[in-house]
Structures are given as C-alpha cells and as structure tokens.
Amino acid sequence: MTLSPYLQEVAKRRTFAIISHPDAGKTTITEKVLLFGQAIQTAGTVKGRGSNQHAKSDWMEMEKQRGISITTSVMQFPYHDCLVNLLDTPGHEDFSEDTYRTLTAVDCCLMVIDAAKGVEDRTRKLMEVTRLRDTPILTFMNKLDRDIRDPMELLDEVENELKIGCAPITWPIGCGKLFKGVYHLYKDETYLYQSGKGHTIQEVRIVKGLNNPDLDAAVGEDLAQQLRDELELVKGASNEFDKELFLAGEITPVFFGTALGNFGVDHMLDGLVEWAPAPMPRQTDTRTVEASEDKFTGFVFKIQANMDPKHRDRVAFMRVVSGKYEKGMKLRQVRTAKDVVISDALTFMAGDRSHVEEAYPGDILGLHNHGTIQIGDTFTQGEMMKFTGIPNFAPELFRRIRLKDPLKQKQLLKGLVQLSEEGAVQVFRPISNNDLIVGAVGVLQFDVVVSRLKSEYSVEAVYESVNVATARWVECADAKKFEEFKRKNESQLALDGGDNLAYIATSMVNLRLAQERYPDVQFHQTREH
C-alpha cells in the first residue's frame, strides 16, 4: 500500500531537541548536524567569540557577546530521506523556562554528555522534563579527542542516575591523543578518526570485520586487542538495542565521538532518522489528535520578541500537530474564539527567515504577533479544543525591579507583561503595594530582561533584592474559604502577567505553614497556559 502524498510528508518528519549540561558541546554538535544536513557550508566554531562568524544557532545581541545560546531557535534540514527539525535549547549556565517548554514540542531528544565528566546537574533536570512525556532519548558521548572516563563507567552512571538503560551502538577505540575511531556493534565496521578535519565532512576510512588484520595495522595491535576484549564485556553486560523500548523511553542508544572533530555525529544522525518517531499524537482537553488527521491543528510553545532588530515584531513559535498548513489559510485561535488568516508564516534557519508556503506535522511555524498570541495557544480549523502539557514553572529566583525614571512606569509594565507572555520571565504585582517582582528559573533571565527593556522599550531599570523564596499559583473550589484565605493573606498575594493569583512565600517554611493552615486551597507548582 502506498501512502498518500500527505502521509508521506508526515512520515518523513523528525523533530528533536538537544539536552546537555553547559559546555558539554551542544552548540558544536548543532553546528555539525547542520553541516551534515547541508544547511551550512563550513562550521564556524563557537570558540571564536571575537570573530564575526558566530555559531549559526546563537543569535540575540547578548548571545553574540557571551557566546551562549539564550534563545530557542529552530532549524530545518534534509538528511537521507527525512526532513529534520532541530529545536535549539538554551544550554549555558543559565537556562530558562523556554528550555523546559521546548521539550514539550519535540518527539525525541538527543542527550549530549561530556565523556570526561559524565552525567551533570542540568542533564538530570532536563531528563526529568522529558520523563513527563516519556520522550525517546538518543545519547552522544562527546569529546573523545580528550581524555575521558572509562566508557563502561559512563554507561553505568547514565543507567543509575537517569534510570534509563543504555544500548551502545558504537564503541570507542582509545581516547585523547590515542583516539583512533569507533567500532559499530551492529554493522561490524570500524570507522577510523583523523584529527584536524573538524570543519568539513571527511571521507572516513572503514575497516570491515572485528578480526580483520587491517584493523591491527590501522590502530595498532594493542588497541585492537583491547577493543576486542572490551566488546566481549560490553556484549555481556549491556542492553541490546530494542526499538520498542527506545520509543517507550526505557533505553537509549549510545554513540561515541567528538563533535569538535566532526566524528561520530553522522552515526548518531543515521540512528535518529532510522529510529526516532515520526510526529506523535497529542492530548487535548477533549481528545487525542493524530498526526495523520487532515484538519490543521497546532500549539504555541514559545514567543520571542525582536528576532529581527530591524523590525519590532514578535514571533510565536507553533508546533504543527496535524494537517497541512497552506499560505493564506484561515485558522481559529481557540482562546479568543477568533478566526485569523495566516499568510506570512515563517520557517527558520537560525537568524535567516524565509516565508513558508506549506508545513506539515512536526514542523515549526513562526507567526507574526503583535501581542495577540500567548504561550499555550491552540490553533485549529474551527474545532474548540486546547492542547495540554505546556506549563508555566514556578520561578526559583526573584528580584524587585525599580525604574531609574519614575515617569516610565507605564512602559515598564507594558514591557514586563509582554516579556512574561513570551516566557522570558514571570512578573508578579503584589496586591498590597505597587512593587513589581520579577521571577525566573535562571539568573541570566534577569540580565536579559534589563537589556531588552532598554533596547526594545527604552526603559532603564535596576534590580533590588526582595524577600521572596518561591511562588505558587493558588485556587480553591470553595469560594467562601478562598475569600477568607485572600483576606488573611493579602500581603502575600500577587497577580502574575496573566492576572492569575499567586501566593508569594518568604521561605519554604512559610509556604508549608500556609499549606497546612489552608488545606482546601491548592498551591500549584506549575500552571497550564
């Protein structure tokens, strides 16, 4: 049976994001993936922070200065017979809620681990978010051109700390200065590494067969024998790759290589297009939507202002769940129940915009937006339903924001509300005073907000410390009890950017006491958009 042209397009799509701890090599691997996808001609390494050729996926001013990827951008490229959508996630010391939310828009994740360090803190946090939806995970052990930890130890650590089985697909031969290449367990082939070829796609020499004398000649008898001994162990002690278990998020195929040396990335990409799922079904508040349905549906997972400094616009990123987008089509924005004609949607190669004529499930569209679209908005061809699972996360850090020029209060509030709709930061307005409190998941979000208020809204602001430890969204089914709670706790209540009521706690103890005192009131750590 041949698939219809529409279903062929759906089956070709692979949508994934990269998760890693800062400096594990995520931006470098993004570059190399784009190089293999022929989206860029030569990989400009990120280390050249002084040069003008910044990594293709890092773009706002501040990112350019710091050499870090603050904004989630989207890149589409062809690979083999597939079309791959890569969603870049902020990966530096200070990520934000955007990173979490981007993981709600993908069908698969690539976990990049620095093989000299193993599993690190940020990787653990991001894996927890992928667990909310049992997202399939591929793993790339990076930096084999440096001295690394014992590969078996690395696999054990991933299994024990992240609670996911490891199925090695390739296995390293040596590391650091002695790194010779990798052996593919399922193809019985050895790929030999040449250093100094990181900027281009290299012709790799392949030796067929583990017992081929050419292998001993190529890597040396000692390393060849060590490889054979290690593989005996590996085959006995590790999981075999099983596609069903991978799709259920229970095992992860593991690849070894060096992104900087541009080696091993293609093996991982081959695995990604072969095994990662085509666009998956999605839950709404009324039913499950299948990618094969012909009516268009999609949801907004991120909003970004000022993607083009020359235009003061904001772009909403929408993941297509079902149906085909065609230029000029009319869509229903479910939250407002209004119909809108979408004629100028964008697709992205980071920083380069191009208008798109059509898009399919798994693709990401950019919608021009002048403040009318919010995170979590669902678009359909008329059906009134809302996609679920795109939450706000309770901030962990808080600052009071103060104007240098008190006459600009109106612009400040406008800027903060827009930035909060976009997910750059959360803003809380205490009921009992005129303060403005800004909440974030990571410190860098505060810097981003001040620099964007200045460049986009001409508002100069500074931060002051504030006695807030955490926030929880509150609601209560019993209106009378809720009124009593609000009356007695007025000094600790605030409205967020969307006018939802939140309890602002001065300490975790204070929060616990409030929860005990008011058992009928629900204190939520996340809030559905």
Curated annotation (Swiss-Prot):
Q: Which species? A: Shigella sonnei (strain Ss046)
**Which Pfam families does the protein's record reference?**
EF-G_D2, GTP_EFTU, RF3_C
Where is this protein primarily located?
A: cytoplasm
Residues the record lists as binding GTP? 20-27, 88-92, 142-145
Source organism, top-level taxon = Bacteria
The record places domain tr-type G at 11-280
Organism lineage reads as: Bacteria, Pseudomonadati, Pseudomonadota, Gammaproteobacteria, Enterobacterales
Tell me the leader sequence span. none
Q: Name one GO molecular function term.
A: GTPase activity
This protein's gene is called: prfC
Q: Where in the cell is it found?
A: Cytoplasm
**Which cellular component terms (GO) are annotated to the entry?**
cytosol
SUPFAM superfamilies from the xrefs?
Answer: EF-G C-terminal domain-like (SSF54980), P-loop containing nucleoside triphosphate hydrolases (SSF52540), Translation proteins (SSF50447)
Q: Which GO terms describe its biological process?
A: regulation of translational termination
* Protein's name according to its UniProt entry: Peptide chain release factor 3
Primary role = Increases the formation of ribosomal termination complexes and stimulates activities of RF-1 and RF-2. It binds guanine nucleotides and has strong preference for UGA stop codons. It may interact directly with the ribosome. The stimulation of RF-1 and RF-2 is significantly reduced by GTP and GDP, but not by GMP.
Keywords (alphabetical) are: Cytoplasm, GTP-binding, Nucleotide-binding, Protein biosynthesis
> Which InterPro entries does the protein's record reference?
EF-G-like_DII, EFG_III/V, G_TR_CS, P-loop_NTPase, PrfC, RF3_C, RF3_dom_3_sf, RF3_GTP-bd
Q: Looking at the keywords, is Zinc-finger present?
A: no
**Matches recorded under PANTHER family:** PEPTIDE CHAIN RELEASE FACTOR RF3
NCBIfam families membership: prfC, PRK00741.1, small_GTP
Please state which protein family the record places this protein in: Belongs to the TRAFAC class translation factor GTPase superfamily. Classic translation factor GTPase family. PrfC subfamily.
